[in-house]
């Protein structure tokens, strides 16, 4: 491993530079990767995430279209729009920003996206391909975590990897990617009886529970690699992760900060999936 603090901003910058070259090759063939981002409602955090994604697209030369719709929009209206984008050759990737308003089914909406344009990697077809070890698109956050571990020279073959959190977006696909890399994987959920004991077994500990401070330094094996996927607001309004950074950093061999760790990598891998989709469409 390299530095104790795993800098996701630095790693993502390297990936974006590589993507610029791939985009330039596509544009030399009169192909410009295109990403459509659909935002329903006025969720402030979603607004920020969408702006960050659009800005990242511009940096690497991806054409992006952002469509904002009111919360009163119906699910059928959104499904109709997705169907139209599925057939648009200028759009290689479709991203529906979550969460959606309560009257919409995220499952039905995600399943309406063509698996060939599902650059978030959430469609059931892409989840199945990931499960069988032949992914078409890897979900962006787990994909970014794997790239971070690779950039730090972390060997996963035979390693004990523990994931705190079992969501469809992070925990479950993260487990599949770690298994494919040769790790022995344990997933902890809200019913896990001895979370601290499980966490202390980890050579690589990935925390994605959505709860600030659920893991602290007393739960970490000395020298372990700690990846904090969480993003929360502390009592002071500042961003914080699921790991108590102060105590964890004293024990861990390497650790990601929040912000500046996994977040930039998630966006970088969204761009990578979009470029990959464009390259496939050009074959």
Curated annotation (Swiss-Prot):
Write down the chemical reaction(s) this protein catalyses: (6R)-5,10-methylene-5,6,7,8-tetrahydrofolate + NADP(+) = (6R)-5,10-methenyltetrahydrofolate + NADPH; (6R)-5,10-methenyltetrahydrofolate + H2O = (6R)-10-formyltetrahydrofolate + H(+)
Domain of life from the UniProt record = Bacteria
Any one GO CC term of the record: cytosol
Q: In which pathway does it act?
A: One-carbon metabolism; tetrahydrofolate interconversion
Keyword Amino-acid biosynthesis assigned = yes
One biological process term from GO is: purine nucleotide biosynthetic process
What EC numbers are recorded for this enzyme?
A: 1.5.1.5, 3.5.4.9
Q: Which UniProt keywords apply?
A: Amino-acid biosynthesis, Histidine biosynthesis, Hydrolase, Methionine biosynthesis, Multifunctional enzyme, NADP, One-carbon metabolism, Oxidoreductase, Purine biosynthesis
**Which residues of the sequence carry a binding annotation for NADP(+)?**
165-167, 190, 231
Query: Which Gene Ontology MF annotations are present?
Result: methenyltetrahydrofolate cyclohydrolase activity; methylenetetrahydrofolate dehydrogenase (NADP+) activity
Query: Which Gene3D superfamilies did the record assign?
Result: Leucine Dehydrogenase, chain A, domain 1, NAD(P)-binding Rossmann-like Domain
- Subunit structure, per the record? Homodimer.
So what family is this one in?
Belongs to the tetrahydrofolate dehydrogenase/cyclohydrolase family.
Q: What does this protein do?
A: Catalyzes the oxidation of 5,10-methylenetetrahydrofolate to 5,10-methenyltetrahydrofolate and then the hydrolysis of 5,10-methenyltetrahydrofolate to 10-formyltetrahydrofolate.
Q: What is this protein called?
A: Bifunctional protein FolD 2
UniProt source species: Bordetella parapertussis (strain 12822 / ATCC BAA-587 / NCTC 13253)
């Amino acid at each position: 491993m390299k530095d104790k603090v795993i800098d996701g901003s630095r790693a993502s910058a390297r990936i974006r530079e590589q993507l610029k070259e791939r985009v330039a090759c596509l544009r030399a063939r009169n192909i410009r990767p295109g990403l459509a981002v659909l935002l329903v409602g006025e969720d402030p955090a979603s607004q920020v995430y969408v702006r960050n994604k659009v800005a990242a697209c511009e940096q690497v030369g991806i054409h992006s279209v952002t469509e904002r719709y009111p919360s009163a929009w119906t699910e059928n209206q959104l499904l109709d729009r997705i169907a139209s984008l599925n057939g648009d050759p200028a759009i290689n990737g479709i991203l529906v920003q979550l969460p959606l308003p309560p009257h919409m089914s995220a499952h039905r909406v995600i399943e309406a996206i063509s698996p060939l344009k599902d650059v978030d990697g959430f469609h059931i077809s892409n989840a199945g391909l990931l499960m069988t070890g032949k992914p078409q698109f890897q979900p962006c956050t787990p994909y970014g975590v794997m790239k971070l571990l690779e950039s730090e020279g972390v060997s996963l073959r035979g390693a004990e990897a523990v994931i705190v959190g079992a969501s469809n977006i992070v925990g479950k696909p993260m487990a599949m990617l770690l298994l494919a890399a040769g790790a022995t994987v344990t997933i902890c959920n809200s019913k896990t009886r001895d979370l601290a004991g499980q966490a202390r077994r980890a050579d690589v500990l990935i925390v994605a529970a959505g709860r600030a401070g659920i893991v602290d330094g007393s739960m970490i094996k000395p020298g372990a690699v700690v990846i904090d996927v969480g993003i929360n607001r502390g009592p002071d309004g500042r961003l914080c992760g699921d790991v108590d950074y102060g105590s964890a950093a004293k024990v861990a061999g390497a650790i990601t900060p929040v912000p500046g760790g996994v977040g930039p990598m998630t966006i970088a891998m969204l761009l990578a999936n979009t470029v990959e989709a464009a390259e496939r469409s050009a074959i």
